[in-house]
């Protein structure tokens, strides 16, 4: 299958990136490099509206078993390749959402198909071990080749998990254990502590808190949900904790026209963070840590300046609490750096860093001082999946070999420049264009218009995603090139020209 996919290369010529800088211009390209076309399709192919009849039937069948209202459509992953997702009705779409930002190097990459066909790797895909107690011989080697090969500065400790939520959940637990250990000192666990914690009683189930930000999304498990504030439907009916919630900067765009206003907004938010830490300490709900996304993704692609994050990092250091950076959606290279918070240019940017999605497995890095002092404190049955570490090692090799971080920065510039042009031509539909690398977005007037634009684009052969109240977000793969950006921009320009 891998050789077949490699053989199915594009016969047509793409054109390289340049654009006509006049209103109503098209985005044009020249011959793309061979690496661009090794396994990608040559374009869209639409046979029906989406969802089509076959998809609608499958949705009905699923809805008998579970609530299927969130389902967009059913996919044919055997036929999906590169940047193109094929559905069960045969529609081939340019996928700029990539499974909620979780596909690193495109669908059915030949390098990964070749990897899983190698006989020595078969047992890793067939047998899923309990990684806390019974590990495969090559587990440490594969960690070094995968996650540890891209470890953030100052991070030598790593625990793998299955998803972003469990990465954050256990990252928060690690912070609580670290904080309590500081208070307790080096002594062990007295019998009184062991007994009272079993019935959820203080002080041995301490009433600590985690400070999070309005608009944040860190997951849907109980602890994570207490730090998630993006959509009410995620939280309603679920008991939660009295933990502090700080405002996240709401920047005005274009940034160069609102420098003073944005500086004041960021200063206001930083001041509120400090005030909340003091307030909750007085309430006997001590803030053990702060959790933040480098870009609030689910909450609306909310950005803040690098200077804001550098100053935010100083607050937990001063207040003697921990700092957790959640790069679940912004990690893996989409911003032009492997980890989004590398843009802050700090030697000590975090105490704990959680990741998942494009990394193909969950997990979190942490400093040595946050290492659990006993077994089973951070634990579950699977603790990730060694087959994903194997795949990730090859993904990282491909990212380095094909220089995909620079590609994300370059293709992202083409996308962002085109979006700014569309904003100038259609200000009634597009505002607040923003982005880093290919991690781009813009606002629409309201959620109704946003949702209509997404549906129209899908029926034109482009998969987009929404976020926040009225934003459209772009989450393409790392093999998204300039010519893919120009293809989208031409399609979306036509959509906006006809939109009513």
From Swiss-Prot:
The keyword Chloroplast does not apply. Substrate binds at residue 220. Residues 1-28 form a transit peptide. Binds 1 [2Fe-2S] cluster per homodimer. It comes from the Eukaryota. GO terms for cellular component: 4-aminobutyrate transaminase complex; mitochondrial matrix; mitochondrion; protein-containing complex. [2Fe-2S] cluster binds at residues 163, 166. The modification N6-succinyllysine is found at residues 231, 252, 413. It is an enzyme of class 2 (transferase). Its cofactor is pyridoxal 5'-phosphate; [2Fe-2S] cluster. The modification N6-(pyridoxal phosphate)lysine is found at residue 357. Keywords: Acetylation, Aminotransferase, Disulfide bond, Iron, Iron-sulfur, Metal-binding, Mitochondrion, Neurotransmitter degradation, Pyridoxal phosphate, Transferase, Transit peptide. One of its GO terms (biological process) is nervous system process. Pyridoxal 5'-phosphate binds at residues 164-165, 381. InterPro entries: 4NH2But_aminotransferase_euk, Aminotrans_3, PyrdxlP-dep_Trfase, PyrdxlP-dep_Trfase_major, PyrdxlP-dep_Trfase_small. GO terms for molecular function: (S)-3-amino-2-methylpropionate transaminase activity; 4-aminobutyrate:2-oxoglutarate transaminase activity; identical protein binding; iron-sulfur cluster binding; metal ion binding; pyridoxal phosphate binding. Its main location: mitochondrion. It is found in: Mitochondrion matrix. Homodimer; disulfide-linked. Belongs to the class-III pyridoxal-phosphate-dependent aminotransferase family. This is 4-aminobutyrate aminotransferase, mitochondrial. It comes from Bos taurus.
């Amino acid at each position: 299958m891998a050789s077949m996919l490699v053989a199915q290369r594009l016969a047509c010529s793409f054109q390289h990136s340049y654009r006509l800088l006049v209103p109503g211009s098209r985005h044009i390209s020249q011959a793309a490099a061979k690496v661009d076309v090794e396994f990608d399709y040559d374009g869209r192919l639409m046979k029906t509206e989406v969802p089509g009849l076959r998809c609608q039937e499958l949705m009905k069948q699923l809805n008998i078993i579970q609530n299927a209202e969130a389902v967009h459509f059913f996919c044919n992953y055997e036929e999906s390749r590169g940047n193109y997702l094929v559905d069960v009705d045969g529609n081939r779409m340019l996928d700029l959402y990539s499974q909620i930002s979780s596909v690193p190097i495109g669908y059915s990459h030949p390098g990964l198909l070749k990897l899983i066909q190698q006989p020595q790797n078969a047992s890793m895909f067939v047998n899923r071990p309990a990684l806390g107690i019974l590990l495969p011989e090559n587990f440490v080697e594969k960690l070094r080749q995968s996650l540890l090969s891209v470890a953030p500065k100052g991070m030598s400790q790593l625990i793998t998990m299955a998803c972003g939520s469990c990465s954050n959940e256990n990252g928060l637990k690690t912070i609580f254990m670290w904080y309590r250990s500081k208070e307790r000192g080096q002594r062990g666990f007295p019998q009184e502590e062991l007994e009272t914690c079993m019935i959820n009683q203080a002080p041995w189930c301490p009433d600590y808190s985690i400070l999070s930000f309005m608009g944040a999304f860190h997951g849907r498990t109980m602890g994570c949900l207490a730090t998630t504030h993006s959509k009410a439907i995620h939280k309603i009916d679920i008991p939660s904790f009295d933990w502090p919630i700080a405002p996240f900067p709401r920047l005005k765009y274009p940034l160069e026209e609102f420098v003073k206003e944005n500086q004041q907004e960021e200063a206001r938010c930083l001041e509120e963070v400090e005030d909340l830490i003091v307030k909750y300490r007085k309430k006997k709900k001590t803030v053990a840590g702060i959790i933040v996304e480098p870009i609030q993704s689910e909450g609306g692609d909310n950005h803040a300046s690098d200077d804001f994050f550098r100053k935010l990092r100083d607050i937990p250091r001063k207040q003697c609490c921990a700092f957790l950076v959640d790069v679940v959606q912004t990690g893996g290279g989409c911003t032009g750096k492997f980890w989004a918070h590398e843009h802050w240019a700090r030697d000590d940017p975090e105490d704990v860093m959680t990741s998942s999605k494009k990394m193909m497995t969950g997990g979190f890095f942490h400093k040595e001082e946050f290492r659990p002092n006993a077994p089973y404190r951070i634990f579950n049955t699977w603790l990730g999946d060694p087959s994903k570490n194997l795949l990730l090692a090859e993904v990282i090799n491909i990212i380095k070999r094909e220089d995909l971080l620079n590609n994300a920065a370059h293709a992202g510039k083409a996308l962002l420049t085109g979006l700014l042009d569309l904003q100038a031509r259609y200000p009634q539909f597009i505002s607040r264009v923003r982005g880093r690398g290919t991690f781009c977005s813009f606002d629409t007037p309201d959620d109704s218009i946003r949702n209509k634009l997404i549906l129209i684009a899908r029926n034109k052969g482009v998969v987009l995603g929404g976020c926040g109240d009225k934003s459209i977000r772009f989450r393409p793969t790392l093999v998204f090139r300039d010519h893919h950006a120009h293809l989208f921009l031409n399609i979306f320009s036509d959509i906006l020209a006809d939109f009513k």
